[in-house]
Each structure stands twice: as structure tokens, then as C-alpha cells.
Swiss-Prot record:
Main localization, broad class: membrane
Subcellular location per the Swiss-Prot or TrEMBL entry: Membrane
Species per Swiss-Prot/TrEMBL record: Homo sapiens (Human)
Description of post-translational modifications: Phosphorylated at Thr-18, Thr-123 and Ser-126 by MAPK1/ERK2 and probably MAPK3/ERK1. Upon phosphorylation by MAPK1/ERK2 and MAPK3/ERK1, acquires the ability to inhibit cell death induced by various stimuli.
Cytoplasmic side, ranges: 1-82
Residues carrying covalently attached carbohydrate according to the record: N133
InterPro entries, alphabetized: IEX-1
Modified residues (Phosphoserine): S31, S126
Role this protein plays: May play a role in the ERK signaling pathway by inhibiting the dephosphorylation of ERK by phosphatase PP2A-PPP2R5C holoenzyme. Also acts as an ERK downstream effector mediating survival. As a member of the NUPR1/RELB/IER3 survival pathway, may provide pancreatic ductal adenocarcinoma with remarkable resistance to cell stress, such as starvation or gemcitabine treatment.
Low complexity composition bias: residue spans: 44-55
Family indicated by similarity: Belongs to the IER3 family.
UniProt name for this protein: Radiation-inducible immediate-early gene IEX-1
Keyword terms: Glycoprotein, Membrane, Phosphoprotein, Signal-anchor, Transmembrane, Transmembrane helix
Length: 156
């Protein structure tokens, strides 16, 4: 009894050709010679000349599908996009500028032979930036950080 892909059991019966009843009593042996020779065996003339599958009937083909081995499929290579590269470069430059920006450092002055007393005085804060200043006095955190950096210059 064989099981097909469905859950219902099926019976497969192979019909073997039945030999014609013999008139010689006793066990029947093969029709070949008793001693092995290289001579070809004579073909029986009684066999009908037809298709060999016609005598067996219609035999079902096996439904096993042979899939190829599992192969890792590779995606096609993307073409380089110059717009993406430029955007990445721009974002990298902006990120580096933000990362390395120093707050509270005055802009570098042009080099002069003799410094004036007016150039040593702190530059006044522009009126445009003043509304954005939300604290009236400098924070203690900024002072603590500057003193720490003066005491430990190799920390950063």
C-alpha cells in the first residue's frame, strides 16, 4: 500500500504478464541454454510486435519535481548615483563643522604689528543675537568646563 500526496491511501498493482500454461509437468526453468555461451538467444516469434507499454497499460508518471540546488541569488549591482554621493559629502561636511564648532570664541582678528587697547576689549554682542540669549548670566557649567580644560589640556 502506498501513500500518494493526498491523505487517501491508494493501492498500486503491477500486472505481470502471465505465462501460457505449459504441458510439461514439473518446475519450469528459463528457456535459455543450460550452459552459458556467447551466442544470442533466439527471440520468441509468438510475441506481438507492438509498443511495449501497451501491454502494461497506462502507468502514471511520478510527480516528483527536481528543483535545482539552493543557490544564493545575487542582487544586481546598483549604479552609482552622483546626487547621492554629493548629498552624503555635504552632510559629512556639515556634521564635521557642527562637531568642531567652538562656542564663545571670538572671530580671529587680522594680524597687526601693534595691538591697540581697543582690540583687546571684548567685542560687543550684536543686537540680532541678543534676543536668542535666554539666560541673563553665564552658566556655571560653561565656567566649570573651561577651568577643567585649562587644568587638563590632554583630556580632549
Amino acid at each position: 500500500m502506498c501513500h500518494s500526496r493526498s491523505c487517501h491511501p491508494t493501492m498500486t498493482i503491477l500486472q505481470a504478464p502471465t505465462p501460457a500454461p505449459s504441458t510439461i509437468p514439473g518446475p519450469r526453468r528459463g528457456s535459455g541454454p543450460e550452459i552459458f555461451t556467447f551466442d544470442p538467444l533466439p527471440e520468441p516469434a509468438a510475441a506481438p510486435a507492438g509498443r511495449p507499454s501497451a501491454s502494461r497499460g497506462h502507468r502514471k508518471r511520478s510527480r516528483r519535481v527536481l528543483y535545482p540546488r539552493v543557490v544564493r541569488r545575487q542582487l544586481p549591482v546598483e549604479e552609482p548615483n552622483p546626487a547621492k554621493r554629493l548629498l552624503f559629502l555635504l552632510l559629512t561636511i556639515v556634521f564635521c563643522q557642527i562637531l568642531m564648532a567652538e562656542e564663545g570664541v571670538p572671530a580671529p582678528l587680522p594680524p597687526e604689528d601693534a595691538p591697540n587697547a581697543a582690540s583687546l576689549a571684548p567685542t560687543p554682542v550684536s543686537a540680532v543675537l541678543e534676543p536668542f540669549n535666554l539666560t541673563s548670566e553665564p552658566s556655571d557649567y560653561a565656567l566649570d568646563l573651561s577651568t577643567f580644560l585649562q587644568q587638563h589640556p590632554a583630556a580632549f
